[in-house]
């Protein structure tokens, strides 16, 4: 019986909220809202537009540092293992490896946006 009352009250509440939204919502369609938007590219234009290598490089660097964070996040729990010195050593090696890669990319000009 309690389950039935809960389901009924939930359905009534949802119906009231949806009805109020439909009655009070202001709609103002304009060409910008009605046109599809796909990451800054015109979806009705040519699908074979060249991709900037700069965006690609920034995406790859983002993935690398995202992976670094995913690897280093469990470090706080891993320090409490039997051999914390080994854990810290591996974390420093991973961090230095990625830092050297970032420095190399920076020195090669891969992070420069201006020509």
Swiss-Prot record:
The keyword Ion transport does not apply. It holds the Pfam family Oxidored_q4. Its EC number is 7.1.1.2. One of its GO terms (molecular function) is NADH dehydrogenase (ubiquinone) activity. The chain crosses the membrane at residues 3-23, 55-75, 87-107. It is found in: Mitochondrion membrane. Keywords: Electron transport, Membrane, Mitochondrion, NAD, Respiratory chain, Translocase, Transmembrane, Transmembrane helix, Transport, Ubiquinone. It comes from the Eukaryota. GO terms for cellular component: mitochondrial membrane; NADH dehydrogenase complex. Its main location: mitochondrion. It is a multi-pass membrane protein. It catalyses: a ubiquinone + NADH + 5 H(+)(in) = a ubiquinol + NAD(+) + 4 H(+)(out). InterPro entries: NADH_UbQ/plastoQ_OxRdtase_su3, NDAH_ubi_oxred_su3_sf. Core subunit of the mitochondrial membrane respiratory chain NADH dehydrogenase (Complex I) that is believed to belong to the minimal assembly required for catalysis. Complex I functions in the transfer of electrons from NADH to the respiratory chain. The immediate electron acceptor for the enzyme is believed to be ubiquinone. PANTHER family: NADH-UBIQUINONE OXIDOREDUCTASE CHAIN 3. Belongs to the complex I subunit 3 family. This is NADH-ubiquinone oxidoreductase chain 3. It comes from Alligator mississippiensis.
């Amino acid at each position: 019986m309690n389950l039935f009352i809960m389901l009924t009250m939930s359905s009534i509440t949802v119906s009231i909220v949806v009805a109020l939204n439909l009655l009070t919502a202001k709609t103002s369609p304009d060409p910008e809202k009605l046109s599809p938007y796909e990451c800054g590219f015109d979806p009705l234009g040519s699908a074979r537009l060249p991709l900037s290598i700069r965006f690609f490089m920034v995406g790859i660097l983002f993935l690398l540092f995202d992976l670094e964070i995913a690897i280093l996040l469990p470090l706080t729990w891993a320090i409490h293992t039997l051999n914390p010195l080994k854990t810290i050593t591996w974390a420093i090696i991973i961090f230095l490896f990625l830092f050297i890669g970032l420095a190399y990319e920076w020195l090669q000009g891969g992070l420069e946006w201006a020509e």
